[in-house]
């Protein structure tokens, strides 16, 4: 299985930190957010990765290179300007191949065994989404779970972690495109499975949340 890490966003709410670095390179617990993902994916047996980039993307490429220093192979998908989630996936489809692939937001942090993600069967679904308890900054939630399927009713928050069939995006035109409208189309057809994440999830969307997680990880390491 291949995995795609989304790393093209500007990170406006993280300025001024993201004036100098792309958000996935911001460090928590002594290493960049994106490196936490890469190491956990490798531990789960996923060694072929696709990473998209736009804002300060050259710094991601300079830092991670071809991935060999981390024991993985990285294929880069450069975007002239950020294409949103679905647009980024559509552009990267030739790099992702014909098998189901995992997608993870590069500006999140997960404390769980990534094998639970990699070993998830898709069955007849076009997508499988991992949901999380609603964080304080998003109390309403996004979607709900109903008999193993995700439905368009606010209850839990979409973690950004998903498993997808390439066919779900095949034939869609190139260009900027959000993922949520596609997900809702598939949900209406009963084609989106889901479950709750079996571990901790953090959306690192502000400087304060980055600092809070970094301090927490440093305390754990003592």
Regions from the PLM with identified roles:
Residues 2-5, 31-105, 145, 171-174, ...:
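Conserved N-terminal catalytic core of the sugar/cofactor nucleotidyltransferase
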Residues 46, 102, 109, 115-122, ...:
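Catalytic-core segments of class I nucleotidyltransferases/pyrophosphorylases
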Residues 55, 128-142:
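Short beta-strand-to-loop element that shapes/binds the nucleotide-sugar donor at the catalytic cleft/hinge
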Residues 1-19, 42:
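N-terminal nucleotide-binding beta1-loop-alpha1 segment
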Residues 24, 73-75, 126, 191-193:
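Conserved beta-strand segments of alpha/beta enzyme cores
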Residues 10, 106-108:
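Active-site metal-binding loops of divalent metal-dependent hydrolases
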Residues 20-35:
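Short catalytic helix/loop segments, enriched in acidic residues and glycine
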